Amino acid sequence: MKTFSILVLVFSTFGGILAGQTVYRAKKIQATPTQVFQPGEILVKAGKIQAIGKSVKAPKGCKIVDWKDLEIYPGLISPSSSMGLTEINALRPTRDEREVGTHTPDVEAWVAVNPDSELIPVARANGITHAVVVPMGGTISGVSALIALDGWGVEEMTVSKKVALHLWWPAHGITIPQPNATGDSKPKSIKEQEKNRDQQIREIDEFFNQAEAYKQTKASKPKNFGPIPAWEAMLPVLSGKKPIVIHADE
């Protein structure tokens, strides 16, 4: 069997090299799903790809890194991840992905990211270079962030602190009560489950209505107006400046 090495290129790892311009040469460069250069070269300046192709024009004095036996692939992005927010599910102190409360739009996931998480180097070794970390728990859980899985601290790792607001739509599944179920294992009646589900949906409507009312009140510039963090976090969502991601599993 023919064996070969595969390299997933994480440019931010090569801090010393990136001080100037660098040309990376490789046996194969997978630029896009349909664009491949064999062999190929990549010109990088300050961590940004400037040119890519079978052969690029190397600026005078730039560093040449020859990886002739390796293959370069784009890094993967892990969407809707708890990377850096959770370590061991069985230990509550290591889980920062869930906040207390059902409506917490002012929660920002990047603040709780642990840059020393043992899961980060494992993900990076498998080709994942970035992750969209999402707060979980409740109905409106907060704002996700895009982080790079390389850096000395959370500030350096964070690419975008505010990606989107996340809303977890109430489950529509109904559990059929069993005649022999007792105690905590006995589910509520079908009518009670439907009532609870409808109530959760009404609470979402009410929350957005209150956020809109806050927006209009603030626009009127009343005296002694004090900002409220939760409603302030909703303003860019209501104005369309920040997207909202709705999670619906059923």
Predicted regions and their residues:
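Bacterial N-terminal signal peptides
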Residues: S5-G16
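Short N-terminal segments immediately surrounding and downstream of signal-peptide cleavage
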Residues: Q21-V36
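Histidine-rich, glycine-flanked metal-binding segment
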Residues: P33-Y73
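Polyanionic/metal-chelating signatures
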Residues: L119, R124-E250
